[in-house]
Amino acid sequence: VPSSAGISSTVVNDTIVIPYNSPEALERVLKSREVACFIVEPVMENIGICLSDEGYLQQVREITQRYGTLLIFDEVKTGITASWGGATGAVGVTPDLVALAKSIGGGLPLGAFGGKQELMDLITEGKVVHLGTYNGNPLCMAAAKAVLSEVCTPATTDLTIARNTLLVNAVSEIINDASLPAHVVKFGAKGCVTWAEKQIRNYRDYKATDFDLAFAQWIHGINRGVLLPPGLDEQWLISVMHTDADALHYADVFDAFVQELTA
């Protein structure tokens, strides 16, 4: 499934796309050839929010271990928005490597990765080169330290997730009362309205959702002070600065949209 122009044949030849939530597809690929690593979002968040099936990630962990393939969690989108331990902590599956960004920087540009000792030793021993002009940038490092120790503490993170649950429940009730072909998906402090009756399980499911209604909802919200990201593939995020009233304001605006939609 192409995502952008400009993807070279070399990248295509070195990459195998495996459908999310399909351990059978993963097993077929790893059984047929040698694969260095399997990179997966524990919860997909560039298609709204696509949750993993029950037991899927546990199966992925078992399959990759059996075939000697590294398991890498892409937590650029999830991170501490999922829980203080990230999506890795929330789902209870430990990968070999994890990539982080966005939320850990507190608004400053920051990316990080970490993993098992034997893998990180490849860098410290000079066997794998890891260079970057802004690696270890003091300003970004100070911000990350403050975020993780002073701002997004375990208690504060739990509070934002509880506040998101308040919003999710309110929006779900509106959808159910109006019998709309939509549903709400929640993970940690994030949520979204997906305009489809059934929960999506992969990228192809997401492409079949109603983007016209999603765009109409976005425009309606923008004109009433609800500033969601412009990409229809994004989510809302409850931050430590939001209050219960802020969360329920979104629900009120969504309710107004539904009233206009069904009038």
Feature map (PLM): residue ranges:
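Conserved N-terminal phosphate-binding loop of PLP-dependent enzymes in the Aspartate aminotransferase
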Residues: 1-263
